[in-house]
């Protein structure tokens, strides 16, 4: 299954979190699994906050890019359109709230999951967990 980011045109593929054309970024890949989206990411040692744990900014960055990709995919799905069709649906984050419930170990795979909560016009609300 193609990741959402595989459908981004080169002109918008420079994002630090999800851009395939940014060699220094996370280059996340997001796919549908039923009614939710999933990204899998393995932190590197340079993502450390304190020994053994991932930096909180990394978590927020992963949530941000995973969520905007989900918003676009949800709009395509609602419209019954292919993700390569024009005009393109693109989103930026209007609000990001993260509750850090416990430190995130750096030595394993992070699984980011997102569910659509609401589409109202051009506004898409999602809920994401790591």
Protein language model features and the residues they cover:
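HotDog/MaoC-like acyl-thioester-processing domains
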Residues: 1-10, 103-130
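Hydrophobic residues on conserved beta-strands that form the core of alpha/beta folds
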Residues: 27, 93-95, 125
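Short, surface-exposed charged micro-motifs
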Residues: 27-29, 99, 113-115
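Hydrophobic beta-strand-centered segment that forms part of the acyl-chain substrate-binding groove
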Residues: 70-111
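Preference for bulky hydrophobic residues occupying beta-strand positions
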Residues: 39-41, 98, 114, 128
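Non-catalytic linker/capping segments at the edges of enzyme domains
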Residues: 1-51
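A general secondary-structure signal for short beta-strands and their flanking turns/coil
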Residues: 34-36, 93, 109, 123
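A conserved, well-ordered hydrophobic junction motif at loop->secondary-structure transitions
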Residues: 38-74
């Amino acid at each position: 299954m193609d990741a959402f980011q595989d459908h981004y045109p080169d002109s918008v593929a420079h994002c630090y979190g999800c851009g395939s054309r940014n060699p220094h970024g996370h280059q996340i890949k997001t796919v549908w699994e039923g009614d939710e989206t999933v990204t899998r990411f393995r932190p590197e040692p340079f993502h450390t906050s304190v020994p053994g744990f991932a930096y909180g900014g990394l978590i927020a960055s992963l949530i941000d890019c995973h969520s905007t990709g989900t918003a676009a995919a949800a709009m395509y799905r609602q419209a019954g359109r292919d993700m390569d069709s024009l005009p393109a649906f693109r989103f930026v984050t209007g609000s990001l709230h993260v509750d850090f419930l416990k430190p995130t170990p750096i030595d394993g795979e992070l699984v980011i999951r997102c569910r659509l909560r609401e589409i109202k016009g051009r506004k898409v609300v999602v809920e994401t967990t790591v």
